[in-house]
């Protein structure tokens, strides 16, 4: 088995009484697009700074390709960082910006020229080497910053929220650019973001962080569909969180009491015990709405009324208030020609989902 490129072992970083990173351990593989995801203050940027060498852990160790990085200065690590601010020299051309770290390292001019040319090709800016940064779009400037980081051929590229300053359309375009670039150059990317959609779109694996700890480390599809905690379910995308109590366990099915709604079946996802408090996490797109629902033993359904709706173009978000006052968010596609919405505010509906559409987590 190939050893991991990066090993983070029991790393802790404190600032006075505040623990920014709390006993974090994880491994990152060669060629992986790995994302540290979490809200502000969760510790993701502090962890990134320790990987770069800008900060040091109070305890634990960080190993890159087997080497302990303790005491290794940032400029001596085979690691480069791309920041949100680009940090380009305004008085230098694009090519000169990219060449700068090579000149500082004393690389021969002939090799500098060849590597700058290749870096420009890698980021699809081969014809922009003579331009000044002010003559480029925001997305192009970000690509120059990435090219400058890649030109030294690092083993590891760290990206600290590099797309957050771009508008929504450009962010989507740059996400595709980053995916293609990472595949082309084969360098391991460690990406920091608070944007859940960005993390889901870009990553091979995601570490969801909360209060200095890793709450879940999995592939994007697993994190979205099978969150391990209430926090992960709530933080990743839209999710209905229904408090419940385990009533009985029968093989792979669990009978739960949805407080105020009654007993329903759900798929067993942890070693649930009768009487244990739990939360049914249910994505809005898993719920269907109808004026009436035909009884089905594998479905859960409740009566309610459309309380609010939000037209989003390709889908409409319906807020359905159930008979006990609980509210469910439901997403339905707007696929009917000439009809934007299926229901209006005030319409009586039934909300239904398959028993295995939700995912149970401990309360």
Curated annotation (Swiss-Prot):
Role noted for this protein: Part of the ABC transporter complex PotABCD involved in spermidine/putrescine import. Responsible for energy coupling to the transport system.
Keywords, alphabetical: ATP-binding, Cell inner membrane, Cell membrane, Membrane, Nucleotide-binding, Translocase, Transport
Domain of life: Bacteria
GO MF term set: ABC-type polyamine transporter activity; ATP binding; ATP hydrolysis activity
Topology versus the membrane: Peripheral membrane protein
Localization terms from the record: Cell inner membrane
EC number from the UniProt entry: 7.6.2.11
The protein's name: Spermidine/putrescine import ATP-binding protein PotA 2
Subunit structure: The complex is composed of two ATP-binding proteins (PotA), two transmembrane proteins (PotB and PotC) and a solute-binding protein (PotD).
Binding locations of ATP: 38-45
Disulfide bridge partners, by residue number: none
Gene behind the chain: potA2
Family as reported in the entry's similarity comment: Belongs to the ABC transporter superfamily. Spermidine/putrescine importer (TC 3.A.1.11.1) family.
Organism for this UniProt entry: Pseudomonas aeruginosa (strain ATCC 15692 / DSM 22644 / CIP 104116 / JCM 14847 / LMG 12228 / 1C / PRS 101 / PAO1)
A UniProt-annotated Pfam family: TOBE_2
GO cellular component: a single term: ATP-binding cassette (ABC) transporter complex
Signal peptide: none
Catalysis: reaction(s): ATP + H2O + polyamine-[polyamine-binding protein]Side 1 = ADP + phosphate + polyamineSide 2 + [polyamine-binding protein]Side 1
Domain ABC transporter: 6-236
